[in-house]
């Protein structure tokens, strides 16, 4: 019988992944729910249901494939819902969730999404990932301007440990940053209530006009801006997974739990990269343990869904941004190397990287999708017309 161990850096990678995911977008989820008229108690129930759903799916998929598969809510989808759900009843919002997730299940069951992912060159997938993560690296060091002591101390701790004890570099930055923030009074002192909030069932109402005007764009944004980068992240990190099966599982789980506020469950990209990095574990075959740790922290976050927003507001944003940037540094560097390594694919990869990093949104769809589209077209044209 094999012994089981969870190294501290692996555990911390899972913690940082969940921390970054919640800190960067939990407020958007609250705004989307509030736009549909949800009460504070109902919104807290949404956070509970989402945390439990992400925890269960992350644990199940990672244990099944022995691959660091991290699930997440759709942040681009939530941003769309903030405006799309204005004036919509909660029952109609649930109807939109069910409609969109049913389309996701169909897309996975037919294998259409898997076929699209197979034709994306590896260099373009890596370039897209680098473009997605670039802003997190930039945000980390932008904090030096106003929080020099905090960010500088975290960077110094990371550099020292990176040279001497590489696997503990992010852990050291987290601890030193927390100590500096606490000592300088940057951590809010308000009490964070620890209470379990039971999710509330809301019967769906299907309004055809809303399904087309909000549900269909929500489906497209979720697939193009969340699931596609999520699978590209796995591909860029060297992992092979059954795309269709994962889409069906995630979409099916969200479909079942939509009446409780689970508006989407997707394959994570940015936070997953933390669990897929060398800092999580030097052995790529053991990095699934970091995703398992993240799944456990998701469950804890779900059990105390009503406390998440208060906790996030107590942490200094500069600490979270620097922590995310340092945790993703290795992944950004590796992705850039993979993107430009093949000279014949370099131009298309650079275009993919730049468009993705630009943050441009066209037709309500984010830059990650358009980066791959332009990169793919460029790759096809250059491959067909370039002289040998």
Where in this protein do the model-derived segments appear?
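Short, motif-level signal for alpha-helix interfacial/capping segments enriched in acidic residues
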Residues: 51, 238-240, 341-344
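Hydrophobic alpha-helical interface/terminus motif in multipass membrane transporters
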Residues: 32, 81, 116, 137-141, ...
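Short glycine/serine- and small hydrophobic-enriched flexible loop segments
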Residues: 34, 82-86, 235, 277, ...
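Alpha-helical membrane-protein architecture signal
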Residues: 8-11, 153, 212-213, 248-252, ...
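Helix-loop-helix hairpins and the membrane-proximal interhelical loops
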Residues: 1-44, 171-244
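Membrane-embedded alpha-helical modules
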Residues: 86-192, 293-388
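Residue-level signal for transmembrane alpha-helical positions in Major Facilitator Superfamily
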Residues: 23-24, 149, 225, 267, ...
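Helix-loop-helix junctions within the multi-pass membrane cores of secondary transporters/permeases
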Residues: 2-4, 10-29, 48-129, 241-329
């Amino acid at each position: 019988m094999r012994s089981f161990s969870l190294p501290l850096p692996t555990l911390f990678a899972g913690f940082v992944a969940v921390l970054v995911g919640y800190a960067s977008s939990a407020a958007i989820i609250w705004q989307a729910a509030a736009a549909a008229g949800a009460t504070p108690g109902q919104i807290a129930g949404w956070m509970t249901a989402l945390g439990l759903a992400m925890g269960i799916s992350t644990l199940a998929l990672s244990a099944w494939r022995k691959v660091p598969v991290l699930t997440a809510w759709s942040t681009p989808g939530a941003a769309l819902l903030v405006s799309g759900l204005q004036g919509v009843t909660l029952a109609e919002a649930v109807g939109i969730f069910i409609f969109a997730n049913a389309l996701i299940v169909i897309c996975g069951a037919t294998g259409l999404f898997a076929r699209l992912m197979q034709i994306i060159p590896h260099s373009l997938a890596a370039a897209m990932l680098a473009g997605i993560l670039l802003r997190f690296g930039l945000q980390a060091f932008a904090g030096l301007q106003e929080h020099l002591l905090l960010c500088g101390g975290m960077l110094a701790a990371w550099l020292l440990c990176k040279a001497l004890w590489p696997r503990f570099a992010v852990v050291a930055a987290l601890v030193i940053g927390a100590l500096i923030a606490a000592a300088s009074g940057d951590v809010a002192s308000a009490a964070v209530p620890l209470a379990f909030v039971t999710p509330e069932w809301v019967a769906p109402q299907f309004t055809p006009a809303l399904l087309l005007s909000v549900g269909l764009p929500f489906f497209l944004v979720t697939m193009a801006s969340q699931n596609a980068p999520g699978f590209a992240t796995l591909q860029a990190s060297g992992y092979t997974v059954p795309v269709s099966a994962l889409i069906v599982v995630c979409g099916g789980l969200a479909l079942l739990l939509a009446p409780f506020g689970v508006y989407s469950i997707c394959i994570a990209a940015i936070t997953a990269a933390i669990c897929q990095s060398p800092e999580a574990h030097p052995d790529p075959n053991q990095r699934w343990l970091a995703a398992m740790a993240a799944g456990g922290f998701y469950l804890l976050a779900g059990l105390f869904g009503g406390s998440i927003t208060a906790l996030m507001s107590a942490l200094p944003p500069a600490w979270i941004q620097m922590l995310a940037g340092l945790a993703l540094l290795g992944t950004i560097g590796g992705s850039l190397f993979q993107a430009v390594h093949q000279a014949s694919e370099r131009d298309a990869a650079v275009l993919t990287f730049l468009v993705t990093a630009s943050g441009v949104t066209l037709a309500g769809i984010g830059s990650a999708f358009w980066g791959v589209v332009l990169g793919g077209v460029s790759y096809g044209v250059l491959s067909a017309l370039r002289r040998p």
